[in-house]
């Protein structure tokens, strides 16, 4: 993993161009790998834990219970390619509980996390896409991700996050042999069929 990028990004997507992480999944460009990880939180109110972040219901949410920063830890059993993180928030419903500044960190464990980027959110409603990059590479390979809520809107203390999805690029696309045409020599033609 290269040195941290420390880049600030501001996200305020207009409602008409709302991101949809499921669209890319349905097209087969990415796959959701959050189910392959162990999730933990820095704190939560009873009944508003990590299961609410992963239930695919936009009306439920994780609610923290403690001092900032609030942390979502995502640990994979093996090094995993990650290309994007999607976070669903709703400023209209959550107001001061809505994150306004988040940090994305990556590493092999809690002791060597490096900040990849910091993102400012301005009254976000809907899916917020966070591209995960390491320099010019469009994805990273990591054992652990950490999403840290650094501050909330209106100086709120606790935070609400409604959903989180973790995307990995689809590897090993298979192409039909017809794209390559017919073999022209006898040496290659003997490999054209399987007995």
Swiss-Prot record:
InterPro entries referenced in this protein's UniProt entry, alphabetically: APC10/Doc1, APC_su10/DOC_dom, Galactose-bd-like_sf
Transmembrane segments: none
Coiled-coil features, chain-numbered ranges: none
Domain DOC: 9-193
Signal peptide: none
Pfam families in the cross-refs: ANAPC10
Domain of life: Eukaryota
UniProt-listed GO biological process terms: anaphase-promoting complex-dependent catabolic process; cell division; endomitotic cell cycle; mitotic cell cycle; protein K11-linked ubiquitination; regulation of stem cell differentiation
Region Disordered, annotated ranges: 1-21
Keyword terms of this UniProt record: Cell cycle, Cell division, Mitosis, Ubl conjugation pathway
Gene Ontology CC terms: anaphase-promoting complex
CDD domains in the record: APC10
Role description: Component of the anaphase promoting complex/cyclosome (APC/C), a cell cycle-regulated ubiquitin ligase that controls progression through mitosis and the G1 phase of the cell cycle.
Quaternary structure (record): The APC is composed of at least 11 subunits.
PANTHER family named among the record's database cross-references: ANAPHASE-PROMOTING COMPLEX 10, ANAPHASE-PROMOTING COMPLEX SUBUNIT 10
Family as reported in the entry's similarity comment: Belongs to the APC10 family.
Protein name (Swiss-Prot/TrEMBL): Anaphase-promoting complex subunit 10
Annotated organism of origin: Drosophila melanogaster
Gene coding for it: APC10
């Amino acid at each position: 993993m290269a040195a941290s990028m420390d880049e600030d990004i501001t996200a305020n997507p207009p409602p008409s161009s709302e991101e949809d992480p499921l669209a890319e999944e349905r097209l087969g460009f990415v796959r959701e790998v959050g189910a392959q990880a162990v999730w933990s939180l820095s704190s939560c109110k009873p009944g508003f834990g990590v299961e609410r972040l992963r239930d695919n219901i936009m009306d439920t949410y994780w609610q923290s219970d403690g001092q900032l920063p609030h942390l979502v830890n995502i640990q994979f059993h093996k090094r995993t390619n990650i290309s994007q993180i999607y976070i669903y928030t709703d400023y209209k419903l959550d107001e001061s509980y809505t994150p306004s500044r988040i940090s994305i960190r990556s590493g092999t464990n809690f002791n060597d996390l490096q900040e990849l980027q910091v993102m400012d959110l301005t009254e976000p409603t809907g899916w917020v896409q966070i591209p995960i990059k390491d320099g010019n590479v469009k994805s990273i390979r990591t054992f652990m991700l950490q999403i840290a809520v650094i501050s909330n809107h209106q100086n709120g203390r606790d935070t609400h996050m409604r959903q989180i999805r973790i995307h990995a690029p689809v590897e090993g696309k298979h192409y039909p042999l017809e794209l390559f045409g017919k073999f022209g020599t006898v040496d290659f033609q003997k490999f054209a069929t399987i007995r």
